Amino acid sequence: MVSLLCCGPKLAACGIVISVWGVIMLILLGVFFNVHSAVLIEDVPFTEEDIFEDPNPPAKMYRLYEQVSYNCFIAAAIYIVLGGFSFCQVRLNKRKEYMVR
């Protein structure tokens, strides 16, 4: 029988902890980028043309903020998937403990 178990119990538990932390952090970052937090301006990928040559500079900056916000939410979704994988590995490890050899 093929086993889907590929991580040990400690690695799977570590994966869950890191996934939970990553999801919380990235969702908060996504929310703060979505409300156009001025503190995060250094993380917005803009050029001088975006500021000086655009007739409506705030709109362009807001679009860039929202783009980074969406990227944070996508990364949080990936962390959720990896957390689910780690949770499945924990369950498989628990099941393996109770199996008769």
From Swiss-Prot:
Molecular functions (GO terms): RNA endonuclease activity
Species of provenance: Xenopus laevis (African clawed frog)
Location in or out of the cell: Membrane
Biological role: Endoribonuclease which preferentially cleaves ApU and ApG phosphodiester bonds.
InterPro entries associated with the record: Ribonucl_Kappa, RNase_K
Top-level taxon of the source organism: Eukaryota
Phosphoprotein is among the record's keywords: no
Gene: rnasek-a
EC numbers on record: 3.1.-.-
Protein name: Ribonuclease kappa-A
